């Protein structure tokens, strides 16, 4: 049965060709009543088109606002075909008005046309594993859809009903996602593209997801994924036209397969272990010469991008389980506050940078890439906040160094584990790679302390064995060596066949079992040991048989430095007796506080030079500095000595003032004093490690003055000369008799605590690069002030100490200076009263609050004014003296108000006292009662 189109509101007003339609419509159509049984007033989403194009809607216009994972395309083939067919029709699609008024329209179409459309949809729709259900009832839920799936024996991966965000009501369509395309196709064919849910027919369509490659683009320079509207890369700033790279979604530039023998590795990264090399994949990012290293933002946190909005914590942990042991405390999924769905990224925080770098390298080396819930994951280092980026340049350099070496350490650990854990270095035909840029001169390990020094070491690949610097085929390691700095001074090196260092008191001695446990490489190949300088004779150890170690030569014997592998802190062994860490590869002892190495054989302190890749004695740079300065002239010496004496006196005065202020404090005086005889021998030893530790702290104040400065300090020789007279520290008191003696003996004693030639403070055991730094240390350092006070108290006798403590206790008490001043000068006489200018005025004091208590006198201003007009005292006012004689007195207001209130007062005035007022009140009440 064919239904005629009824005119809408626009047709009645003649908006869209009402005149033409009046010729087709008969009179009975205009007079026909509405048959509401044939009408469908449901407000489900529908599509309609108009010639103007301003009312073209499709299903995706309502789906895209709430859909996050299933982004339907705005124009599918079926919808475009329908639009073309509707445009060719002269009157538009049957059953749809042109003006948008569809309250009294019939939405049913002919059966033949509907079947034709269904056939076209079946032919033109592209199969997908996501099925869209349209025309759902308002009361339908996800459970109803799952019930339909279970009735057909189909297991769906996810069912999502689209709802209005504000009201929460169903929008009439839903999505069903299947794990496989075959399941979705089988379900569509079994139901003939329609379902019956809650007694209503529901249409089924394949979802046409929007290709995301048209939305985002990848930068072929840095590999960062950018938004579609971004015209240039937000990381490297390359324009989109130059840097756009058509790659599948989720594919990263650093995940492309490179040839196994490729040399284009990112600086600071080592090849992956053998299992990944077998697959032909190198986990390194190909960076251009101008690009920044990938370790710039390295930290202990990894970010996972391009996550499915419905991915949960369990799915992420399950996907990462084969690569790392993580818990829910390590993973943080960022969710939307309104929808409670994740925003497409998550963070993984590990305990150290090494673990994070290791996991990052593994995940980026996967082929195919990591996939979670059907989406390819992009893995990168997480960037810090803006306030973290605002750090100074020195800390950034140090952080970059630690991050680079951490990545190298992670890769080296993987490679060592894959090779069986024999502890041998990997042999290779390619030349050794230079990683000396890890060791920054000023930033290396200065601000990170002990923890950073554990990781801030590079790992060298390509050498024949640990510590081997010779050419291939030369087992003795005596082959030609290339120096990194041809013009640099040489340091003596000597190779020996077995590492068997001698032991000193408190120094670790390697046993024969420990030597043999290092593998066969330690026996067949040689180590290279530095010959450091002697710093202190007290550190000399008892002689032990050490014939395997030849005597060291002078530092100027060679012109090139022997190169060593970068120290591996993880292989060090802790020695409880000395407190140092023993390096079994080089036989040196490592101090983590100062980062110095100690050679027990030559009793020298060494430090690691990253540029030369060798161990340099601590005295080398200071000796060079003295050679360059040369011998000063005679006039320069005199000026220097004069300036030195003047500076010492100023420092002595400053320390004297500080000592006086220190006497006011009671705390830690007894604990700070320790006799010299009670100190242990090891506490009295001078150590260059303290110099390096203080240089790290001193670096913040004078960074420019401390470049390439050796932290050398000779020992304090015992002085056999008689000590100067001992006296008390000058106290803050004008009655101290020993103040003058202390002023004479103090500067001479303190002058001996400073070595102006070597620019060292012998009291604090510190050496400085310039005289200004030494003076600043003596004036401002709290450590120097504390050591100076301890040094002064150490030279006092017991009686002097008791007197000093007694004086300190007296100083801690309250001192009544006013009483002392009164006793000394007496009590001053009170000042004389001031003389008044006018003697005629009575000096009697008048209470300003009660001036008329005794009555009005004749000296007031009112009386004088009346007398000026002819009035005399005692007469009445007026022309004929008929007025009042006595002045009007002020009376208290009537107490009380309303009915029953007395009409008179008790005769009490405001000038009466409380006692007089009470007396008058009692008398008045008594009289009234009678």
From Swiss-Prot:
Start and end of every RRM domain? Answer: 129-209, 300-384
Q: Share an example GO biological-process annotation for this protein.
A: mRNA splicing, via spliceosome
Q: Locations of Basic and acidic residues compositional bias?
A: 1-14, 21-45, 98-111, 623-639, 653-669, 700-709, 743-753, 815-826
Boundaries of every G-patch domain copy = 858-904
Write down which residues bear the modification named N6-acetyllysine: 383
Q: Where is this region: Disordered?
A: 1-127, 466-524, 537-569, 620-685, 700-753, 815-861
What highest taxon heads this organism's lineage? Eukaryota
List localization entries: Nucleus
Disulphide bonds in the chain: none
The record's GO molecular-function terms, alphabetically, read: identical protein binding; miRNA binding; RNA binding; zinc ion binding
> Which chain segments does UniProt annotate as zinc-finger regions (C2H2-type)?
759-784
| Stored InterPro entries | G_patch_dom (IPR000467), Nucleotide-bd_a/b_plait_sf (IPR012677), OCRE (IPR041591), RBD_domain_sf (IPR035979), RBM10_OCRE (IPR035618), RBM10_RRM2 (IPR034992), RRM_dom (IPR000504), Znf_C2H2_type (IPR013087)
User: Sites of the modification Omega-N-methylarginine?
Assistant: 902
Polar residues bias (residue ranges) = 508-524
Residues that bear Phosphoserine: 61, 89, 718, 723, 733, 736, 738, 781, 797, 845
* A GO CC annotation given for this chain: nucleus
Which controlled-vocabulary keywords does the entry list? Acetylation, Metal-binding, Methylation, mRNA processing, mRNA splicing, Nucleus, Phosphoprotein, Repeat, RNA-binding, Zinc, Zinc-finger
Compositional bias (Low complexity) spans? 541-557
Subunit comment: Associates with the spliceosome. Component of a large chromatin remodeling complex, at least composed of MYSM1, PCAF, RBM10 and KIF11/TRIP5.
Role noted for this protein: Binds to ssRNA containing the consensus sequence 5'-AGGUAA-3'. May be involved in post-transcriptional processing, most probably in mRNA splicing. Binds to RNA homopolymers, with a preference for poly(G) and poly(U) and little for poly(A). May bind to specific miRNA hairpins.
Anything else of interest in the record?
Answer: RBM10 transcripts also code for an alternative open reading frame (alt-ORF) coding for the MINAS-60 (AC P0DW28) protein. MINAS-60 and RBM10 ORFs are overlapping and are formed by shifting the reading frame.
Disease linked to the protein: TARP syndrome: A disorder characterized by the Robin sequence (micrognathia, glossoptosis and cleft palate), talipes equinovarus and cardiac defects.
The protein's name in its UniProt record: RNA-binding protein 10
Organism of provenance: Homo sapiens (Human)
Q: What gene is this protein translated from?
A: RBM10
């Amino acid at each position: 049965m064919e239904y005629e189109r009824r005119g809408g509101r626009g047709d009645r007003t003649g908006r869209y060709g009402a005149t033409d339609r009046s010729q087709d419509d008969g009179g009975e159509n205009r007079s026909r009543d509405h048959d509401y049984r044939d009408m469908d007033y449901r407000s489900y989403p529908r599509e309609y088109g108009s010639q103007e194009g301003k009312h073209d809607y499709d299903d995706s216009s309502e789906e895209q606002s709430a859909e996050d994972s299933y982004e339907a395309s705005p124009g599918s083939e079926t919808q475009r075909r329908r639009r073309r067919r509707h445009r060719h029709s002269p009157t538009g699609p049957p059953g749809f008005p042109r003006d948008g008024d569809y309250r009294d329209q019939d939405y049913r179409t002919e059966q033949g046309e509907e079947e034709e459309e269904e056939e076209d949809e079946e032919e033109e729709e592209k199969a997908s594993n996501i099925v869209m259900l349209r025309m759902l009832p308002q009361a339908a839920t996800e459970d109803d859809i799952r019930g339909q799936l279970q009735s057909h024996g189909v297991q769906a991966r996810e069912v999502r009903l689209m709802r209005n965000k504000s009201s929460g009501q169903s929008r009439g369509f839903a999505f069903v996602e299947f794990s496989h395309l075959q399941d979705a196709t089988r379900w569509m064919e079994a139901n003939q593209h329609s379902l019956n849910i809650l007694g209503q027919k529901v249409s089924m369509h394949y979802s046409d997801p929007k290709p995301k490659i048209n939305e985002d683009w990848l930068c072929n320079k840095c590999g960062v994924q950018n938004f579609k509207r971004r015209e240039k890369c937000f990381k490297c700033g390359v324009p989109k036209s130059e840097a756009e790279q058509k790659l599948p979604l989720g594919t990263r530039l650093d995940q492309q397969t490179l040839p196994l023998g490729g040399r284009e590795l990112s600086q600071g990264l080592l090849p992956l272990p053998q299992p990944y090399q077998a697959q032909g994949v190198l986990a390194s990012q190909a960076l251009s010469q101008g690009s920044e290293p990938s370790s710039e933002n390295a930290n202990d946190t990894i970010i996972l991008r391009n996550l499915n909005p419905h991915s949960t914590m369990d799915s992420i942990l399950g996907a990462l389980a084969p690569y790392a042991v993580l818990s829910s405390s390590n993973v943080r999924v960022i969710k939307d506050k309104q929808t409670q769905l994740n925003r497409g990224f998550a963070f993984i925080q590990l305990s150290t940078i090494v673990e994070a770098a290791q996991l990052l390298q593994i995940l980026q080396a996967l082929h195919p890439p990591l996939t979670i819930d059907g989406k390819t994951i992009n893995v990168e280092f997480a960037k810090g906040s803006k306030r973290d980026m605002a750090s100074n340049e020195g800390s950034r350099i140090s952080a970059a160094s630690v991050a680079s070496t951490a990545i190298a350490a992670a890769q080296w650990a993987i490679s060592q584990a894959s090779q069986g854990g024999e502890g041998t270095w990997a042999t290779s035909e390619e030349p050794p790679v230079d990683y000396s840029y890890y060791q920054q001169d000023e930033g290396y390990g200065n601000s990170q302390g002990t923890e950073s020094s554990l990781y801030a070491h590079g790992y060298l690949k390509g050498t024949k064995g640990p510590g081997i610097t010779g050419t291939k085929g030369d087992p003795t390691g005596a082959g030609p060596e290339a120096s990194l700095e041809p013009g640099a001074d040489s340091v003596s090196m000597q190779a020996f066949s077995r590492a068997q260092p001698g032991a000193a008191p408190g120094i670790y001695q390697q046993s024969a079992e420990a030597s043999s446990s290092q593998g066969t490489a330690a026996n067949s190949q040689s180590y290279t040991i530095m010959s450091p300088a002697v710093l202190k004779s007290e550190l000399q150890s008892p002689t032990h048989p050490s014939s395997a170690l030849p005597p060291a030569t002078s530092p100027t014997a060679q012109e090139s430095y022997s190169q060593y592998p970068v120290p591996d802190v993880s292989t060090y062994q802790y020695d409880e007796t000395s407190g140092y860490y023993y390096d079994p590869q080089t036989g040196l002892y490592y101090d983590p506080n100062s980062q110095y190495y100690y050679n027990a054989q030559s009793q020298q302190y060494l430090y690691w030079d990253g540029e030369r890749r060798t161990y340099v004695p601590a005295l080398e740079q200071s000796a060079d500095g003295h050679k360059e300065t040369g011998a000063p002239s005679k006039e320069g010496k005199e000026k220097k000595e004069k300036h030195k004496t003047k500076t010492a006196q100023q420092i002595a005065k400053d320390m004297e003032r500080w000592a006086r202020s220190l006497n006011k404090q009671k705390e830690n005086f007894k604990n700070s004093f320790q006799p010299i005889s009670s100190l242990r021998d090891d506490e009295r030893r001078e150590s260059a490690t303290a110099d390096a530790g203080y240089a790290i702290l001193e670096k913040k104040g004078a960074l420019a003055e401390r470049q390439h400065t050796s932290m050398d300090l000779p020992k304090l020789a015992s002085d056999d000369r008689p000590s100067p007279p001992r006296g008390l520290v000058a106290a803050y008191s004008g009655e101290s008799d020993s103040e003058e003696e202390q002023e004479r003996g103090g500067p001479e004693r303190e002058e001996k605590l400073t070595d102006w030639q070597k620019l060292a403070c012998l009291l604090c055991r510190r050496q400085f690069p310039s005289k200004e730094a030494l003076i600043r240390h003596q004036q401002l350092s709290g450590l120097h002030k504390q050591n100076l006070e301890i040094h002064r108290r150490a030279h006092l006798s017991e009686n002097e100490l008791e007197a000093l403590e007694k004086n300190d206790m007296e100083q801690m008490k309250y001192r009544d200076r006013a009483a002392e001043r009164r006793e000394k000068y007496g009590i001053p006489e009170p000042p004389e009263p001031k003389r008044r200018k006018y003697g005629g005025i009575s000096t009697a004091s008048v209470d300003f609050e009660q001036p008329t208590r005794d009555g009005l006198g004749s000296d007031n201003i009112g009386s004088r004014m009346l007398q000026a007009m002819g009035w005399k005292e005692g007469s009445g006012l007026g022309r004929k003296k008929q007025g009042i004689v006595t002045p009007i007195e002020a009376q208290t207001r009537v107490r009380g108000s309303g009915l029953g209130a007395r009409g008179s007062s008790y005769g009490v005035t405001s000038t009466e006292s409380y006692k007089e007022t009470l007396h008058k009140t009692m008398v008045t009440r008594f009289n009234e009662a009678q």
